[in-house]
């Protein structure tokens, strides 16, 4: 996963709106454009950026292009983010244990 490309793709509110629409399932580009009140070329531009970042898949059927979320990408992203939460929680637990140990080993006890 190219984090810089992903963050750049997510930095546009309209792209985040597209992802929200795609949570419900696969949609054709034309319907995405219609729901967002955008021109087809502008919608295609944003969809291409999301595709390049690996956030969506594209499927062509006759004259239509359908898009869907790349859910495995989001699962990997959540796992990557979770590692920082674990580290923070571990540091907090270590700090609590150190305080408890120093309190219990205090000569005043």
What is each PLM-predicted segment?
Residues 1-2, 73-109:
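Amphipathic alpha-helical dimerization/coiled-coil segments
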Residues 2-41, 61-73:
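N-terminal helix-turn-helix DNA-binding core of bacterial DNA-binding proteins
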Residues 12, 52-53, 66, 89, ...:
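Short amphipathic alpha-helical "recognition" segments used for binding
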Residues 32-34, 43, 95-96, 100:
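Terminal low-complexity, poorly structured segments
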Residues 34, 51-52:
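Alpha-helical residues within the helix-turn-helix
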Residues 46:
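Residues within the DNA-recognition helix of helix-turn-helix
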